[in-house]
Amino acid sequence: MSLRAVPGYFAAYPSEGFQGLDSTKYDHLELINHKNWKELYHAIPRNTKNRHYKLLILARHGQGYHNAAILRYGMEKWDAYWSLLSGDEHGEWLDSKLTPLGKDQVRRTGSNVLLPMAKQLGMLPHVFFSSPMRRCLETFIESWTPVLAETQELPAGTKISTRIIEGLRETLGSHTCDKRVAHSMAVDEYQDFSTESGHTVHWQYVPDYPEDDELWLPDHRETCAEMDKRTLNGLFELFNQLSSEEKFISLTCHSGVIQSVLRNLQHPPIYNLDTGKVVAVVVEVPVNTADRGRL
C-alpha cells in the first residue's frame, strides 16, 4: 500500500480520473459534497486496522523577495542569471524572507481561509509542521496569528510548537533562494517568536539538526524525480510522527513541495497556485508506513 489522496471532498479532486484544474480560474478549495468544514471532517473515513485518514492542509508561503524578482526580470532571465545571485538592490533572496506584500497575502489567508476553517471545525490542527526556510517560518507566524487571536482556549503566552521537516523544502540546488541559512541564524531570529496575538511559536528541530545546509548544491538543480523521492521520504517522516487520533494536520511549505506531494499522493495537479494560497487533501495513510523505511 502507498499514500494516496481520497477524492470527493474538494473541487481539486472531485472523482477518480480528474485531470486537474487551474487555480486562477477555479476555486480548488471549494467543498463539493459538504456544507462546511465540520461536516466534511466527520465524513472522512474512520481509521481501520490497516489505514489511517488525515486532513492535510498544505500552505504555500507568501511572496518572497525571489518571487518578486521573478516578476521583475521574467523567468528566463531569472533562471539564467538572477537566481544564481543572492539578491539585488530591492532585497536579498538567499533563503528569502517575505516581502511586505507576501506578509499581507498570508495574513489574508489566515483571516479568510484558516480562521473560518478552524472555527467550523472547532479546533486548531492537531500538529503543525513547516519547511525550515525563512519564508515558511514567517508565513506560519503571519497566517496563524489571526487564528490564534480568536482561539480562546489558548490564552496569551501559550507556546505553539511547530515541527520542522528538513526534507520538505523547495527544489534543491543552484538557486540561492533555496539555500538554507545557518541554523543558528534562523534560531536567533525566529525561535520562541512572540506573535501579535501574544502567543509564542517554538520550532521543534530533530536532535543534531545540521548547522549548515547539507542538501543544497551550487552545481546541481534537483530533478523532478529526485524531488519526488525526497518529498515522499519527508511525508513518511511527517506521518510517522502522528498518532491515530491526530487527524487534522498543517504543513507550511512551497509550491514545488505541494506539487510533489500531490504527485506522490496520486492527486490531480493544481496549476498556477499563487503565493499565500492553501490546498487541502484527505490522505489515506498505510498503518505500516513506519515499516517502509526510507526509499
Swiss-Prot record:
Domain of life the protein comes from: Eukaryota
A molecular-function term among this protein's GO annotations: phosphatase activity
The active site of this protein is located at 61 (tele-phosphohistidine intermediate), 170 (proton donor/acceptor)
Keyword list (alphabetical) reads: Cytoplasm, Isomerase, Nucleus
The first-level EC class reads: isomerase
Q: What is its main location?
A: cytoplasm
Q: Where is this site: Transition state stabilizer?
A: 254
Q: Which residues form a coiled coil?
A: none
A GO cellular component annotation here is: cytoplasm
Report whether Kinase shows up as a keyword of the record. no
**Could you tell me the EC number(s) of this protein?**
5.4.-.-
Q: State its location(s).
A: Cytoplasm; Nucleus
The answer to whether keyword Isomerase applies is: yes
Family assignment from sequence similarity: Belongs to the phosphoglycerate mutase family.
What miscellaneous comment appears in this entry?
Present with 3250 molecules/cell in log phase SD medium.
Q: What does this protein do?
A: Probable phosphomutase that may have a function related to the manipulation of phosphate groups on carbohydrates. Reduces trehalose-6-phosphate levels when overexpressed in TPS2-deleted cells. Reduces 5'-Phosphoribosyl-4-carboxamide-5-aminoimidazole (AICAR) levels, a metabolic intermediate at the crossroads between AMP and histidine biosynthesis pathways, when overexpressed in a ADE3-ADE16-ADE17 triple deletant.
| Listed name of the protein | Probable phosphoglycerate mutase PMU1
**Gene name tied to this protein:** PMU1
